[in-house]
Amino acid sequence: YPMPLPGGIGMEGAGVVEEVGPDVTGFAPGDRVAYAAGPPGAYAQVHNMPARSVVALPEAVGFEAAAALMLKGMTVQYLFNRTVRLEPGQTILFHAAAGGVGLIAMQWARAMGVTVIGTAGSEEKAELARRHGCDHVILYRSEDIVERVREITQGAMVPVVYDSVGKDTFDASLAALAPFGTMVCFGASSGPVPPVPLTALRGTLYLTRPSLLAYAERREILESMAGGLFEMVGSGKVRPIIERRMPLAEAAQAHSDLEARRTTGATLLQP
């Protein structure tokens, strides 16, 4: 996601409203708020946000939880409820099960009664995914993803694959789908996926590339997604997995660790 430079970075955060513009309604100084869809610039002590991109933060959800969950949690909310509406009893394949989005997805799927086959790069990450609700873990460095999915599902394969890895897993993701299945490519941490011929969809498969910003463009959908997330957090069904807290001055190191896949869960930057 290239951005024009110079400019701020960071997409999600939580805090207290200090001032509001003359035409703003619905918010006032002192309000607790959070955001994950709007202009970048969260890596700052003060962030000027358009009111349409901010949501009220319930007292039951703390600032750290909101900062750790907003973007990732609302991503899972739309993936599981809007991109494809999952149903209890289904089995899905979810890549990067021990990542920031993955650990939230594991908890959410468990609460929905959905069986998850997750992928992870190490036994340590596999165990982390299992602790948070992943039913089966494939170690993608040493195991064949497609064959393991076939074994776990007894040949049925899966109706939905959620793939945020991109180039390295795309072919296996398509091959793991059952007829009329849906491939949800919502990220590309390993690099962009090359152009895909329509024949790769085998006549019955569906391919979509959703994004949070596109879903959150409409205010009512943004509020619905945030409300769904806050309900899951307030009920205890989903909780933030905060791996570490770092000062804002160490943001570059946090990014280096993220790019090198040395992280699990969320890293909080504190001004």
Task: Give the predicted meaning of each segment.
Residues 28, 59-62, 85-91, 155-156:
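Short helix-loop-beta connector
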